[in-house]
Regions:
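Extreme N-terminal starter segment of soluble prokaryotic enzymes
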Residues: 3-10
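Short polar catalytic/cofactor-binding loops
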Residues: 12-18
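Short glycine/acidic-enriched loop and turn motifs that connect beta-strands
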Residues: 16, 84-86, 197-198
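Cys-nucleophile CN-hydrolase/nitrilase-fold catalytic domain and related Cys-dependent amidase chemistry
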Residues: 25-99, 168-187
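Short hydrophobic-aromatic micro-motifs
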Residues: 39-40, 134-139, 161-162, 190
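CN hydrolase (nitrilase-like) catalytic-core segments centered on the catalytic cysteine
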Residues: 62-76, 144-227
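Short beta-strand scaffold segments in enzyme catalytic cores
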Residues: 79-81, 92-96, 126, 191, ...
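Active-site catalytic loop in hydrolytic enzyme cores
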Residues: 85-158, 167-176, 235
Length: 240
């Protein structure tokens, strides 16, 4: 049964390069602090934007800290990680962590920069059901590709969620993309944007995670600092 209100948070926790155990603990702390049904994290948040980081498996015991936090708060965490499929291909992915399981929810479709040297594109748009709400997903470059946005919106989504890594100079583009996706999809948008330095030449990142209304208005936002959380409770527009 669909809940009339969905509380969603976009988090930008501290991240240590290639330290999945430490990063899982910081994710768990963010889940507990957010007090939200859905908590979205940045691209490759479990490893940092380290393009040679080993893949993370869904049964990795280091993720138990996040599972336990989700159980304690009745939350779903959408975390960024490299994953390896049964076919041997490696993807930039969004993992869905709940009290019951860890699963791959989405694989990035549109790769940028040096990513194609290591990663393969995902199979296409995907949707995740949380408390009756349909969440469409994207990762960084996906958010700027019209075909991806159109195909995801066509799945009939209520919320579009994405994990990002951007420089401070890219923040205006990040905000414009979110507002555009919201208006085109007629959906709420939650962008979790990396804060603090990370790999890939990102000495500075934008942070400024935020949540937008279907009209493209900002409902909640974090600053550029590490540890920020944007949180909003959004109401089912079907009731209007």
């Amino acid at each position: 049964m669909r809940s009339p209100v969905l509380t969603i948070a976009a988090s930008q926790p501290a991240c240590k390069a290639n330290d999945v155990a430490a990063n899982a603990r910081s994710h768990a702390a963010a889940v507990r602090a957010a007090k939200a049904q859905v908590v979205v994290f940045p691209e490759l948040s479990l490893t940092g934007y380290e393009l040679q980081a080993p893949p993370v498996s869904c049964d990795d015991a280091r993720l138990n800290a996040i599972v336990e936090a989700c159980a304690a708060t009745d939350s779903v965490a959408l975390v960024g990680a490299p994953v390896k499929g049964d076919d041997g291909l490696i993807h930039i992915a969004m993992l869905c962590v709940s009290a019951r399981s860890v699963k791959v929810a989405y694989r990035k479709c549109y790769l940028g920069g040096k990513e194609p040297m290591r990663f393969s594109p995902g199979p296409g748009s995907a949707v995740l059901d949380v408390d009756g709400w349909r969440l469409g997903m994207g990762i960084c470059k996906d958010t700027g590709v019209a075909a991806h946005v159109r195909d995801t919106a066509a799945l009939g989504i209520d919320v579009y969620v994405a994990g990002l890594v951007h420089t401070p100079e890219e923040l205006p583009s990040q905000e414009m993309r979110a507002a555009s996706i919201a208006q085109e999809s007629k959906a709420f948008v939650a962008f979790a944007s990396f804060a603090g330095p990370t790999g890939g030449g990102y000495e500075r990142t934008a942070g400024s995670s935020a949540i937008w209304s279907p009209e493209g208005d900002v409902l909640a936002s974090a600053g550029p600092e590490v540890g920020g959380i944007a949180r909003a409770s959004v109401r089912d527009t079907q009731d209007d």
